[in-house]
Regions:
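Charged substrate- and nucleic-acid-binding regions of tRNA-handling and nucleotidyl-transfer enzymes
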Residues: 57, 61, 119-209
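Divalent metal-dependent catalytic cores for phosphoryl transfer on phosphate-bearing substrates
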Residues: 3, 7-127, 131
Length: 209
């Protein structure tokens, strides 16, 4: 219950049911994913994915609201994402994806990740804390540069149809997804540059068909 206790200590505005349930259930998938490796180590690969599914199933059976089930299972699924940050420098696009994937749960994900540090090794604990401080600072900088919490492609659906000369259909969704990825990779782009990239993508699609 150490993670739960540490999560509760981070609550600034009173009890947070979503955070507390996520702290309780974040490692629920470990027993099902436990493997003994040849070198003697024990692994729990993908326990966050398995745990998210188990969380959804159990909370649904307990008659929690659909919204609460969705949020808690999402936090369980994302609780390991930060650990990739400490092993190598993330690009700005990776930070954008982290924020996008967390969505309105970002603040709770911050707290859950910090509370999941249970090591007694003070040097390791301090290193993790510094790494997370660094990630939060980068997120804050990017949010100042662009409204990261409301990322949209540089062109909307009507502009896409106008530029490509096509009507509504599945291709608009595909183009929108392409432009969103472009936005995540490069940040804000001028309309002319976005239109040029869209035309280049469209030409490649037609060449492949």
């Amino acid at each position: 219950l150490i993670v739960l206790e540490q999560a509760m200590a981070l609550e600034a505005d009173g009890p947070d049911l979503r955070l507390r349930l996520a702290a309780l259930l974040h490692d629920i998938g470990k027993p099902k994913t436990r493997r003994f490796e040849k070198d003697g180590r024990v692994s729990f690969h993908h326990h966050e994915v398995v745990g998210a599914k188990m969380t959804k199933k159990r909370m649904t059976a307990l008659k929690y609201s659909n919204e609460l089930v969705k949020d808690v299972s999402r936090l369980v699924e994302l609780h390991l994402r930060f650990h990739g940050y400490g092993t190598g420098e993330w690009t700005d696009s990776a930070v954008r994806r982290y924020v996008r994937d967390a969505g309105p749960l970002l603040d709770r994900l911050h707290k859950l990740t910090r509370s999941d540090c249970t090591t007694r090794n003070k040097r390791k604990a301090n290193a993790l804390s510094r790494a997370y401080d660094g990630l939060e600072e980068r997120i804050a900088r990017l949010q100042e540069q662009e409204e990261l919490d409301a990322i949209r492609p540089d062109l909307d659906g009507n502009e896409i149809m106008e530029i490509l000369g096509v009507g509504p259909g599945p291709v608009i969704g595909q183009a929108y997804k392409f432009l969103l990825e472009l936005r995540l990779e490069n940040g804000p782009t001028e309309r002319d540059a976005a239109a040029a990239a869209l035309k280049e993508w469209w030409a490649a699609q037609n060449a492949d068909s």
